[in-house]
């Protein structure tokens, strides 16, 4: 009996999912490139009217809003805010701030109880404001709390999506709060210090050309180490890992290098371009949340503005308490207790060269406390929600 065996090759089906992911990644890169390209002239234009070290954040906010709105209006394409760009921006800013801290953060360790008290006060106020907002807007308590507790636009919106809550509303209130703080506090600081404002606006020409080739290898090394540390911090879910990890690298990089026996006396500082890019990315991601907003009614916007106003009032009360409990001046207290925009507020203190160590420690304590306590907050909010539904 003759038997013939035929072997049919098994053809792998094309991975449409991988192709879609690649296309999405390319679209995100193109959008980010356009935003950066637009943020440059906007930052330069703002620098003509506003002398300060964080104009690139404002340029990024405008660029992110305009580009995403343009995608929606002209191409009927609604890209989501780029959270990866936010992480990279936080890492760049953390690296810049860390390398600029000449003092020792342990010198302000005695103030940690004050920082913890102020953080708990702001969290308690955020909970009360969230309850009031939920009653006014007739929304569930979990959505209201996620919208009003200072914890970052991206983080709170992502949690709202995980629990099937009103993501656009959470992002709206958080974006209003962060934008208001980021735009208002620098102008208050500039007005208060007057001629003592340190004009650290970073010209593009200086940022691009002020690259010391002898330190280019060190720049690549520090970026590689920062990327590794930030990746591990995010992987192990360390609170505010992208900012905190880069900050530690910025503080300790020179000391670690000088401890090596085969390395001489080295003092490395990241070039201004890193600061410019970090500020742009922070601003762009804030602006993207504005460009991504659907249409809200006047009543919804009114309630959102009321909750933000209450949050700002709570921050002002916390600043007054800090003035009574410490020897800090009022500007330091204002920067420490500003409800949101931690990296941006530290940048303001850096531009002013005003108690950078105190402001940095205060915001780090708050970031760690808020992110570490999120599971407890979520448990309580969901429990209160279920009880209210039963009643």
Each language-model region and where it sits:
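Intrinsically disordered, low-complexity non-transmembrane regions of multi-pass membrane transporters
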Residues: 1-38, 72-73, 78, 194-216, ...
């Amino acid at each position: 009996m003759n038997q013939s065996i035929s072997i049919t090759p098994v053809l792998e089906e094309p991975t449409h999912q991988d192709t879609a992911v690649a296309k999405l990644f390319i679209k995100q890169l193109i959008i980010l490139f356009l935003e950066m390209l637009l943020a440059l002239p906007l930052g330069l234009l703002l620098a003509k009217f506003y002398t300060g070290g964080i104009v690139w954040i404002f340029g990024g906010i405008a660029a992110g809003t305009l580009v995403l709105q343009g995608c929606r209006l002209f191409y009927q394409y609604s890209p989501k805010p780029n959270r990866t760009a936010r992480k990279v921006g936080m890492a760049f800013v953390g690296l810049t701030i860390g390398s600029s801290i000449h003092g020792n953060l342990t010198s302000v360790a005695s103030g940690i109880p004050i920082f913890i008290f102020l953080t708990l006060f702001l969290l308690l106020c955020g909970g009360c404001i969230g309850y009031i907002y939920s009653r006014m807007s007739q929304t569930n308590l979990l959505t209201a709390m996620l919208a009003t507790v200072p914890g970052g636009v991206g983080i709170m919106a992502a949690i709202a999506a995980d629990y099937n809550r009103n993501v656009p509303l959470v992002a709206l209130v958080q974006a209003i709060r962060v934008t208001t703080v980021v735009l208002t506090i620098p102008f208050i600081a500039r007005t208060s210090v007057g001629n003592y404002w340190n004009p650290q606006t970073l010209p593009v020409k200086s940022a691009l050309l002020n690259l010391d080739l002898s330190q280019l290898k060190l720049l690549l090394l520090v970026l590689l180490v920062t990327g590794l540390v930030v990746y591990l911090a995010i992987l192990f879910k360390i609170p505010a890992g992208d900012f905190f990890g880069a900050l530690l690298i910025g503080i300790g990089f020179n000391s670690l290098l000088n401890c090596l026996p085969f390395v001489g006396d080295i003092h490395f500082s990241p070039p201004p371009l890193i600061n410019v890019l970090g500020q742009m990315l922070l601003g762009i991601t804030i602006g993207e949340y504005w460009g991504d907003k659907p249409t809200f009614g006047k009543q919804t916007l009114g309630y959102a503005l009321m909750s933000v106003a209450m949050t700002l009032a709570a921050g002002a009360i916390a600043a007054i308490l800090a003035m009574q409990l410490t020897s800090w001046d009022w500007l330091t207290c204002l920067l420490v207790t500003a409800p949101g925009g931690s990296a941006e507020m530290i940048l303001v203190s850096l531009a002013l060269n005003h108690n950078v160590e105190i402001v940095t420690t205060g915001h780090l304590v708050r970031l760690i406390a808020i992110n570490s306590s999120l599971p407890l907050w979520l448990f309580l909010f969901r429990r209160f929600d279920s009880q209210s539904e039963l009643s």
